[in-house]
Swiss-Prot record:
Keyword Mitochondrion: no
Xref: HAMAP family: NusB
Gene Ontology biological process terms, A to Z: DNA-templated transcription termination; transcription antitermination
Keyword terms: RNA-binding, Transcription, Transcription antitermination, Transcription regulation
Any one cellular-component term (Gene Ontology): cytosol
Family: Belongs to the NusB family.
Protein task: Involved in transcription antitermination. Required for transcription of ribosomal RNA (rRNA) genes. Binds specifically to the boxA antiterminator sequence of the ribosomal RNA (rrn) operons.
InterPro entries according to UniProt: NusB-like_sf (IPR035926), NusB_fam (IPR011605), NusB_RsmB_TIM44 (IPR006027)
An example Gene Ontology molecular-function term: RNA binding
Protein name, entry field: Transcription antitermination protein NusB
Cystine pairs: none
C-alpha cells in the first residue's frame, strides 16, 4: 500500500476517533484503543493516526477558536462530522507544516464528501480556505502569485 493511501486511512481513522470523542466524551486512550481495533487499521499510518488524534483532542478549544471566526454559527451547532473534520484539518494546518495546505484541504474535502452531509464538503472547503490564509500566510501567498 502506498504511503499516500496509508496517510489517507490514518486521517479517516483519526476522524472516526474525533467523531467518537465528540459524541461520547470517552477518554482519548480508550478511543485510540477502540479505533486501532477496527478492520483495516493495519493499512493505516499508525504514527500519523496517533499524532492526529492526540494532537487534535489535546487542543480542541484552541483549534475551535482558530476556525470559529469563519463559521456563521456557534461551533457546537455544527454537525459532529463537519466539526471533527474542521478540528482535524485545523490541527494539520497548524502543526503539520511539512504537509502542503492544499493537500490538507483536499483531504478534508474528501472526508466531508465521504462522511458528511450533502454540501458539507463545500462548507469545509470555504472555512479551511479562509483559515489557511491566516495559518499558512507565506505558503498561500506563494501559491497565489
Amino acid at each position: 500500500m502506498s504511503s499516500k493511501a496509508a496517510r489517507r486511512r490514518a486521517r479517516e481513522f483519526a476522524l472516526q476517533g474525533i467523531y467518537q470523542w465528540l459524541l461520547s466524551a470517552n477518554s482519548m486512550l480508550l478511543i485510540e484503543e477502540h479505533v486501532s481495533q477496527v478492520s483495516g487499521f493495519d493499512k493505516a499510518d499508525r504514527e500519523l493516526f496517533i499524532s492526529l488524534l492526540r494532537g487534535t483532542l489535546n487542543n480542541v478549544d484552541d483549534l475551535q477558536a482558530e476556525f470559529a471566526p469563519f463559521i456563521h454559527r456557534a461551533v457546537h451547532e455544527l454537525s459532529p462530522v463537519e466539526r471533527a473534520i474542521l478540528l482535524l484539518a485545523t490541527h494539520e494546518l497548524k502543526h503539520n507544516l511539512d504537509t502542503p495546505y492544499r493537500v490538507i484541504i483536499n483531504e478534508a474535502i474528501e472526508l466531508a464528501k465521504s462522511y458528511g452531509g450533502t454540501d458539507g464538503h463545500r462548507f469545509v472547503n470555504g472555512v479551511l480556505d479562509k483559515l489557511a490564509t491566516q495559518l499558512r500566510v507565506t505558503e498561500v501567498s506563494a501559491g497565489r502569485s
